[in-house]
Amino acid sequence: MMLDPQIAARLKRNADGLVTAVVQERGSRDVLMVAWMDDAALARTLETREATYYSRSRGQQWVKGETSGHTQYVHSVRLDCDGDTVLLTVDQVGGACHTGDHSCFDADVLLHPQD
């Protein structure tokens, strides 16, 4: 799958050719996770609506939920003003975090809201 050249031209990738992907749950608006995408992962996500990312540690693409069953159906993808981050709005099935938690931001609160 090839990324549309008009979209590719707008992306500002890091030195490894990746863009940051912020993943937000459609219903709750919670931020679920942050991941990386290369052009091919973004193209596949746009084509299939299955959240597809790039694993820096494994050096390959992965489809969220392919092995765990904890899938992300992508409703929308937005590019930020700088072109270096995409925002995916998803329906999450199961936990988004590799720990099994609903969100990767469920564990450690560094600053609690004021009352």
Curated annotation (Swiss-Prot):
Its EC number is 3.5.4.19. It is found in: Cytoplasm. Pathway: Amino-acid biosynthesis; L-histidine biosynthesis; L-histidine from 5-phospho-alpha-D-ribose 1-diphosphate: step 3/9. Its main location: cytoplasm. Its cofactor is Mg(2+); Zn(2+). Zn(2+) binds at C81, C97, C104. Keywords: Amino-acid biosynthesis, Cytoplasm, Histidine biosynthesis, Hydrolase, Magnesium, Metal-binding, Zinc. GO terms for molecular function: magnesium ion binding; phosphoribosyl-AMP cyclohydrolase activity; zinc ion binding. InterPro entries: PRA-CH, PRib_AMP_CycHydrolase_dom, PRib_AMP_CycHydrolase_sf. One of its GO terms (cellular component) is cytoplasm. One of its GO terms (biological process) is L-histidine biosynthetic process. Mg(2+) binds at D80, D82, D84. The keyword NAD does not apply. Binds 1 Mg(2+) ion per subunit. Binds 1 zinc ion per subunit. SUPFAM superfamilies: HisI-like. It catalyses: 1-(5-phospho-beta-D-ribosyl)-5'-AMP + H2O = 1-(5-phospho-beta-D-ribosyl)-5-[(5-phospho-beta-D-ribosylamino)methylideneamino]imidazole-4-carboxamide. The keyword Aminoacyl-tRNA synthetase does not apply. Catalyzes the hydrolysis of the adenine ring of phosphoribosyl-AMP. Belongs to the PRA-CH family. Homodimer. This is Phosphoribosyl-AMP cyclohydrolase. The lineage of its organism: Bacteria, Bacillati, Actinomycetota, Actinomycetes, Mycobacteriales.
